[in-house]
Amino acid sequence: GRSIYSVGDLYSGYDQFQLAVDSCDITTMRTPIGLVRMCTLPQGATNSVAHIVNAMNKVLKDCIPSITMPFLDDIPIKGCSDEEKDESEDKDGCRKFVMDHMKDCEKVLERLENANLTFSGEKSAFGQPEILVVGHLCGAYGRKPSPSKVNVINDMKEECVTQMEVRR
């Protein structure tokens, strides 16, 4: 486990990736208000996930795996391990391991800014003792499944009847 974490989620993740101009026409669909043509990466399209994974790996290549392991548009930023943790204070009274973590956060943010990508302020958190990443809680204790996800399974009826019950 780690003593400090941060997590960022891209603001409208898929919408931040522009489609090639010649690809826009093949996304055209009819709606009650007329034809709509996508100009950004459509969420749920066959190759959208692969495109996001490749783009994030390219943008953050020098930060993977030492600082982050992005999952689609979720970007967890891990602090130092307990073995590397330096509790000494700098001249401003901030612990060194916290400052090191903030420098790592800055490095990730710079890479995203250079790629014209933006974090969502509402869905991002910095300098936290625990974060939720892809259904798992990460903290000083290590990683464990989120209790809310486990409770859904524990509270499940013996037999699922509807599609909605199966999906939960």
Identify the function of each model-found stretch.
Residues 1-168:
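Retroelement reverse transcriptase polymerase core
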